[in-house]
Amino acid sequence: MEDIIVLFNRVTEKLEKELAIRIFVLAHQLERDKAIRLLQGLFWRYRFKKPRVDYCLCWWCCKFYYWQLQSTLSITTA
């Protein structure tokens, strides 16, 4: 799991917040090797894009953002 987190952090530093959260959810749903291939492909695709400094999108921050999104959705649908 550690290699996925490191790769995820390197990829998401160049993405928008919504896309990073979607990839976070997808990484939990896919098998480990498929998630790694997806992240490697995205890393290659965005290799020349400048990192975003607006906000942190590391694994743990995306986990927090996803938790916030889930709690907001459960409150509004209740």
From Swiss-Prot:
Map motif Nuclear export signal onto the chain.
35-43
**Subcellular location(s) per record:** Virion; Host nucleus
User: What stretch of residues is annotated with the motif Nuclear localization signal?
Assistant: 45-54
Keywords assigned:
Host nucleus, Virion
An annotated GO cellular component: virion component
Explain the purpose of this protein.
Answer: Seems to function as a Vpr-like protein, since it mediates host cell cycle arrest in G2 phase. Cell cycle arrest creates a favorable environment for maximizing viral expression and production.
Please state what the protein is called.
Answer: Probable Vpr-like protein
Q: What is the scientific name of the source organism?
A: Feline immunodeficiency virus (isolate Petaluma) (FIV)
